[in-house]
């Protein structure tokens, strides 16, 4: 394969070269328009939007408008924000418009780049979604780029987690909507639970640009979005099962599989559990739940670790995002795992929940007509992006070549030796005033390192889930001379670390609103770092207040500039990785925090043979290295075998995780096809005021099923007319059937069908006439939606249980996925048939009277109570009560949140 790739590269050039060849001519075309666009006054420039839209209405494509639109955005950005798009940013924008992933290094201006494709696609009038990883970035990016869009007459909306229905509707009605992946996904699910089409908030899924696309479409791909309702199960069973875990022995009663993040009971363990719980057969049908709880309790004790996977704060178990180190407050593991951890930590145990609606990010984002993404690290996952999302990765060259020096890894035998070497390097770096960002993979490790630094008298900041409130401040100061910052993984991602520390004077400039021409010139000279001219302008200001403010800004700039030059002289920001992550991409993200926009920088990883990656995924040959004799303590291991083993281990884990994500998608595709059918049916009801043709079709199908069941064939003497009559009486059809009458017919069964159908149709029409057409139409729709939601909820519950138990068919050498598809299809077929029967039964049995009033529409949209993301649940907000067809009330619940590669496997139990 490598030889073929090499031949293709020689003949056609590398993919990178081929991509550039396509982009460069378009960039030249854009640049050729720059002078003519510059010559436009503000009024003419802002009217470009109207002209573009008119051309689109006349049939012109977005592709043909692209050069002019991009040149327009570039000029507007320069006039409103003082930022001109570089040519490489133009390339990134073209790639985004083409429905690709633009890989742009940290500091290359991805947010500004996105404005090009966002503006162009907003002209189509179908709405553009810009997807970010958290609420803060959604709001920041929208407000930051808003001057460009405002100038061009393009509206901007922002979705935030705490918004109500009306606020969301307004945000989605805008030309451009910023929000998180979770909010977009949950709004889609909620839209498919509303009782009236006007209650929907989202429009079409036309075009989405996903920022940090690797984080959302790869890291969180195993995180199903789930809207759930409370279950009636008691919580005392968790306490009961939790007590038996300390009595079980690892190796004898159970085995821990760290690679798969799983625990398996041995035969001896099964017997031991049966003995402790005083039961005869743990795997008897009545003990299915018990097996599940024992399994989850074992995982809680043996796989999930406090201060690594979660923290306990104020009597609650709070999940830690594996990829960012951030706390995921309000979110919960699903399938009883969170309750098992609560029992382990001896805190209040919350009730389990039942799924009401769900979708994976994979299937949600594949609904968009066009999808694009941005990140600094996508190329290592190019195969997955192509196979799952049909997205090509286009690597955009940096505007200024990267000056960062990446040094080889230093590997030690033990973790203790590694940390000692790290301490020595940090001390050396701080002595020469070089700022250092220390990346760790867990809170536990960050706190161990923090204690060592404190003992050595080294001042430092820690950024992890326990101190996340100070994140912005800590990240802002991480570039100061001699600053030492410990951060778990990619905490602070999305915010650049500026060499010299935070440029506080910029905030002061932005908030200084003054139309005085001298003040304007002063602000411009500060941004251009022309401090001498700025000082002369300060002297010309016409008031002491203005001069005082200008003086404060100048002082702030001078302090930052001195710090900036000191850091540059020291070598820029140094990245010190304390452990390799399972994915090379995460390591690259950490390295990418240094060397932005041509700044100097450096990076090095310190590893030990006791690190999780080496211990769990390294080959047996590596473990032999730990027995090396005659090596003095603290000496680093320099071996190609170690370096190659690290690379192989990472590739092995990446492949393993890709297989899991692909496996999840294969299972979710079964549910997705069913979800599409249900939501299509639901939308048909919402979009049509009169659904009587749909109901009439259900009535005919129900009648046909009854006749096929009770009156098979054309021999009336063999028919079970008594059962048919019993069914018809239940619907109050008043059906009169004479066997003799049908014996005279050429096709007795068809004649019977026609008679029963016409009787049912007359009964149906008389009910509608009696109550009044308008009331009847609304009543029908309400009945249909309530029964549909109820049946769908029950079907999801059944599919959950099918998924949990389907692994057992593997023992009989059958493929669990094939079996899941077959059984899932049969169950769905039955659910649809039951749905139709129940709707028909309810329609005929519903009591109506002449003075019936029109049912009140549910006007209010409330943020629903419980959300689950990626196997996580979230409790927040109020309740949305929906009456069910059986008269009971269900409290619907909803979601938001992110997830991690391993924590999200909510289905994969065994």
Curated annotation (Swiss-Prot):
PROSITE patterns xrefs: SECA (PS01312), SECA_MOTOR_DEAD (PS51196)
Keyword Cytoplasm assigned: yes
UniProtKB keywords: ATP-binding, Cell inner membrane, Cell membrane, Cytoplasm, Membrane, Nucleotide-binding, Protein transport, Translocase, Translocation, Transport
Compositionally biased intervals (Polar residues): 876-886
Any one cellular-component term (Gene Ontology): cell envelope Sec protein transport complex
InterPro entries cross-referenced by the UniProt entry: Helicase_ATP-bd, P-loop_NTPase, SecA, SecA_CS, SecA_DEAD, SecA_motor_DEAD, SecA_preprotein_X-link_dom, SecA_SF2_C
Similarity comment text for this entry: Belongs to the SecA family.
HAMAP family assigned: SecA
Protein task: Part of the Sec protein translocase complex. Interacts with the SecYEG preprotein conducting channel. Has a central role in coupling the hydrolysis of ATP to the transfer of proteins into and across the cell membrane, serving as an ATP-driven molecular motor driving the stepwise translocation of polypeptide chains across the membrane.
Protein name: Protein translocase subunit SecA
The organism of origin for this protein: Leptospira interrogans serogroup Icterohaemorrhagiae serovar copenhageni (strain Fiocruz L1-130)
């Amino acid at each position: 394969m490598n030889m073929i790739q090499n031949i293709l590269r020689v003949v056609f050039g590398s993919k990178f070269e081929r991509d550039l060849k396509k982009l460069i001519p378009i960039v030249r075309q854009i640049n050729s328009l720059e002078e003519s666009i510059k010559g436009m006054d503000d009024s003419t420039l802002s009217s470009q939007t109207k002209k573009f839209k008119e051309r689109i209405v006349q049939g012109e494509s977005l592709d043909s408008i692209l050069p002019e639109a991009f040149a327009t955005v570039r000029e507007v950005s320069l006039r409103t924000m003082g930022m001109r798009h570089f040519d490489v940013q133009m390339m990134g924008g073209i790639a985004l418009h083409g429905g690709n992933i633009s890989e742009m290094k940290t500091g290359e201006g991805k947010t500004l780049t996105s404005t090009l494709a966002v503006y162009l696609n907003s002209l189509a009038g179908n709405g553009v979604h810009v997807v970010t990883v958290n609420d803060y970035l959604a709001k920041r990016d929208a407000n930051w780029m808003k001057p460009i869009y405002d100038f061009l007459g393009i509206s901007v909306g922002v979705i935030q987690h705490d918004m109500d229905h009306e606020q969301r509707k307004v945000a989605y009605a805008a030309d451009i909507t910023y929000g998180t992946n979770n909010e977009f996904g949950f709004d889609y699910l909620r839209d498919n639970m509303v009782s009236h089409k006007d209650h929907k908030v989202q429009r079409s899924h036309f075009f989405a640009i996903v920022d940090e696309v690797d984080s959302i479409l790869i890291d969180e791909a195993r995180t199903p979005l789930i809207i759930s309702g409370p279950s009636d199960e008691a919580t005392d069973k968790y306490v009961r099962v939790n007590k038996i875990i300390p009595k079980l022995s690892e190796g004898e009663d159970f085995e821990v599989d760290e690679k798969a993040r799983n625990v398996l009971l041995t035969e001896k363990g099964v017997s031991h559990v049966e003995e402790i719980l005083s039961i005869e057969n743990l795997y008897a049908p009545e003990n299915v739940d018990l097996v599940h709880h024992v399994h989850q309790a074992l995982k809680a004790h043996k796989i999930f670790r406090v201060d690594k996977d979660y923290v306990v704060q104020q009597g609650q178990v709070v999940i830690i995002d594996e990829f960012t180190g951030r706390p995921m407050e309000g979110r919960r593991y699903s399938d009883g795992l969170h309750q098992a951890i609560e029992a382990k930590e001896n805190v209040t145990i919350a009730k389990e929940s039942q799924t009401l609606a769900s979708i994976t990010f994979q299937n949600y984002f594949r609904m968009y007509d066009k999808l694009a993404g941005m990140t600094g690290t996508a190329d290592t996952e190019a195969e997955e992006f192509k196979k799952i999302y049909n997205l090509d990765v286009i690597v955009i060259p940096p505007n200024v070549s990267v000056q960062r020096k990446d040094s080889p890894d230093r590997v030690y035998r033990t973790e203790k030796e590694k940390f000692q070497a790290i301490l020595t390097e940090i001390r050396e770096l701080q002595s020469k005033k070089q700022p250092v960002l220390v990346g760790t993979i867990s809170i536990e490790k960050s706190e161990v390192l923090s204690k060592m630094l404190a003992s050595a008298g080294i001042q430092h900041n820690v950024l992890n889930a326990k101190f996340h409130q100070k994140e912005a401040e800590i990240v802002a100061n991480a570039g100061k001379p001699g600053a030492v910052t410990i951060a778990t993984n990619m905490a602070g991602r999305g915010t650049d670390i500026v060499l010299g520390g935070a440029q506080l004077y910029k905030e002061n400039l932005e908030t200084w609103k003054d139309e005085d021409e001298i003040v304007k010139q002063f602000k411009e000279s500060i941004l251009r770092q022309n401090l001498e001219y700025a000082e002369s302008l300060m002297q010309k200001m016409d008031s002491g207040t203005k001069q005082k403010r200008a003086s404060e800004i100048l002082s702030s700039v001078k302090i930052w500039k001195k710090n900036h030059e000191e850091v540059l002289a020291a070598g820029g920001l140094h990245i010190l990785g304390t452990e390799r992550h399972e994915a090379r991409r995460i390591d690259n993200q950490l390295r990418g925090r240094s060397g932005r926009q041509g700044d100097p920088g450096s990076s090095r990883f310190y590893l030990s043979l006791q690190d999780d990656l080496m211990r769990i995924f390294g080959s047996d040959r590596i473990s032999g290295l730990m027995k090396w004799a005659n090596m003095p303590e603290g000496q680093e291991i320099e071996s190609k075998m170690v370096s190659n083993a690290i690379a192989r281990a990472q590739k092995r884990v990446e492949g393993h995780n890709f297989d899991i994500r692909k496996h999840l998608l294969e299972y979710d595709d079964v549910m997705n096809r069913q979800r599409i059918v249900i939501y299509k049916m639901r939308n048909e009801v919402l979009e049509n005021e009169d659904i009587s043709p749909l109901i009439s079709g259900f009535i005919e199908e129900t009648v046909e099923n009854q006749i096929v069941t009770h009156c098979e064939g054309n021999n009336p003497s063999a028919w079970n007319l008594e059962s048919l009559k019993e069914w018809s009486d239940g619907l109050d059809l008043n059906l009169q059937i004479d066997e003799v009458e049908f014996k005279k017919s050429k096709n007795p069964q068809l004649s019977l069908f026609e008679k029963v159908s016409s009787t049912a149709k007359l009964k149906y029409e008389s009910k509608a006439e009696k109550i009044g057409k308008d009331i009847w139409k609304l009543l029908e729709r309400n009945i249909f939606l309530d029964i549909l939601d109820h049946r769908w909820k029950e079907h999801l519950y059944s599919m959950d249980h099918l998924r949990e138990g389907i692994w057992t068919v593997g023992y009989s050498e059958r493929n669990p996925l094939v079996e899941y598809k077959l059984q899932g299809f049969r169950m769905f077929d039955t659910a649809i048939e039951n749905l139709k029967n129940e709707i028909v039964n309810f329609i005929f049995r519903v009591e109506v009277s002449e003075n019936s009033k029109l049912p009140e529409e549910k006007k209010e949209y409330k943020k629903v109570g419980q959300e689950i993301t990626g196997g996580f649940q979230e409790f927040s907000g109020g309740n949305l009560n929906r009456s069910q067809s059986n008269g009971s009330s269900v409290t619907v619940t909803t979601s938001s949140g992110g997830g991690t590669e391993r924590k999200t496997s909510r289905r994969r139990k065994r």
